[in-house]
Design a protein with these regions (language model features):
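Glycine-rich, aromatic-bearing surface loops/beta-hairpins
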Residues: 121-123, 133-134, 147, 154-165
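Short helix/loop capping segments that flank catalytic or ligand/cofactor-binding pockets
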Residues: 97-100, 108-110, 121-123
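Short, charged/polar low-complexity linear motifs in solvent-exposed/disordered segments
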Residues: 59-61, 126-130, 153-154
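Generic detector of low-complexity/intrinsically disordered segments
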Residues: 14, 20, 104, 133, ...
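A surface-exposed partner-binding patch
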Residues: 1-99, 103-105, 145, 163-174
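Compact, glycine/acidic-enriched structural inserts
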Residues: 112-145
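Short, surface-exposed, charged loop/turn segments at secondary-structure junctions
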Residues: 102-107, 114-116
Length: 174
């Protein structure tokens, strides 16, 4: 049984790795994003917006800004990766995004890394086999680099990361 987005958020909050937004507009954001996505929205994305995650470690969440009046709404961040069948959910702070896959149909969507170098044309590598697993991996990212963990350390947290269909795991991406 896999971990849910809410469970992952609770784990990370208990560790002090997760910071929440205090905006309180989750329902409006969910409605607005669902409309932008043509009426369909992955359950994990909805769960992330309900959790109102602002950041995990140094990684900022991409939270759409809700506007009550439709004429005040802007395209915003939601549309940045739609050409690549994804929705941006986190920034790496260097202009790149982690995006939740929208091309997975009825399967639980994976998370991929999108590089600004190619204008986010395609996913470069798999960042998590599910949104919940991705959140746990993201919280370990900087520590893993500092410790010099070997390639594939991610499998200890996300045993299915190397099975993501649209891009290889980071240690296989080259």
């Amino acid at each position: 049984m896999d971990i849910t987005v809410s469970e992952a958020c609770r784990v990370l909050e208990a560790r002090g790795a997760l910071r929440r937004s205090r905006r309180g507009d989750a329902e409006g954001v969910i409605q607005q994003v669902r409309e932008r996505l043509g009426g369909r929205m992955p359950a994990d994305l909805e769960a992330l917006y309900r959790e109102q995650v602002a950041s995990i470690g140094d990684f900022a969440a991409i939270l759409p800004e809700w506007r009550e009046r439709p004429e005040w709404r802007r395209e915003g961040s939601v549309g940045l990766l739609l050409h690549a069948d994804a929705v941006p959910i986190f920034s790496d702070g260097c202009g790149n995004f982690y995006g939740l896959d929208l091309a997975s149909g009825d399967q639980r969507p994976a998370v991929y890394f999108f590089d600004s170098e190619d204008m986010f044309e395609r996913p470069h590598w798999a960042a998590g086999s599910s949104l919940a697993r991705f959140l746990l991996l993201l919280a370990e990212h900087d520590q893993a680099l500092d410790e010099g963990r070997p390639p594939g350390w991610e499998l200890s947290i996300d045993p299915d990361i190397d099975k993501c269909p649209r891009a290889p795991a980071i240690w296989l991406a080259g």
